[in-house]
């Protein structure tokens, strides 16, 4: 029988062989804080950047963002484009759904004059355009919206009642086999937006699945499940959504982190709201009763007023964001512990309210 030392050596050898064959990050310990040194593009959400482990979405990789309708998928990708453009990167949007609103995109901070956009006629054309952009080496971010709208040419040219079994899945599988190597070589971030469908006849387990077959699940380095979990109201008026994102797959850092943030209509991700919440959680912003204070100065009674103060003082907001980003990305275990503490405190308060 093998000794513990021999088992440890055998495990180390096996892990080394796997990383040599499939690349660094193919396997890691769940609680491991080590991350790959990969360039990242911010998502526009500080908490999501921290949950991803490297400060955003990884360059040179494929990312899938999926969720139900009106959950914030396109808003999140437009936020990624806005952040990439601020960093001087070239972005392209392949609008297979033919539904991109340039006015809304501009409100989220996207420079629509510089954004490359294509509205292809069929799935083959969309993926050929994506391939050409990636191969050029001149485009840094490509968004495909969405996989469900990548309709094969044969289906478009056929009759309405014709059956085309597995056409879209085969199309995606072939395209990803071609794309994946070029994406790595050109250091381009390719984001596929996907929709959710229900599997028929599933009694046990999750009946939800994504469109386009299984190929994208395997080729994606990061998969984000985005959901709308509530509404934000100003009186009786709904002004935004409470959004939850779970990192269901992550090849560049430990997966399964979950974050909540707000998406405000016409504004996008509430950056100042996140700064207040994360600042309180990590002791950079003090909360006493309903009052919030930052560096000894009271900044507002209630979260809304504190957010207004940050909006009126962008320099202070930028400093607070930089402090949080550097502290949490340098110490991901601290961020995880703070999340667990906050969750336990909320559970305790729920139990107390029940009594």
UniProtKB/Swiss-Prot annotation:
Q: Which Gene3D superfamilies match?
A: P-loop containing nucleotide triphosphate hydrolases (3.40.50.300)
Its GO biological process annotations read: DNA recombination; DNA repair; SOS response
Acyltransferase is among the record's keywords: no
Where, per UniProt, does this protein localize? Answer: Cytoplasm
Naming one, the record's GO cellular component terms include: cytosol
Q: Report the CDD domains cross-referenced here.
A: RecA (cd00983)
Keywords of the record, alphabetical order, are: ATP-binding, Cytoplasm, DNA damage, DNA recombination, DNA repair, DNA-binding, Nucleotide-binding, SOS response
Residues reported to bind ATP: 67-74
An example Gene Ontology molecular-function term: single-stranded DNA binding
Among InterPro entries, the record links this protein to: AAA+_ATPase (IPR003593), DNA_recomb/repair_RecA (IPR013765), DNA_recomb/repair_RecA_CS (IPR020584), P-loop_NTPase (IPR027417), RecA-like_C (IPR049261), RecA-like_N (IPR049428), RecA_ATP-bd (IPR020588), RecA_C_sf (IPR023400)
Question: Which top-rank group of organisms is this from?
Answer: Bacteria
Its family remark reads: Belongs to the RecA family.
Report the function annotation for this chain: Can catalyze the hydrolysis of ATP in the presence of single-stranded DNA, the ATP-dependent uptake of single-stranded DNA by duplex DNA, and the ATP-dependent hybridization of homologous single-stranded DNAs. It interacts with LexA causing its activation and leading to its autocatalytic cleavage.
Protein name (database record): Protein RecA
Which species expresses this protein natively? Answer: Histophilus somni (strain 129Pt)
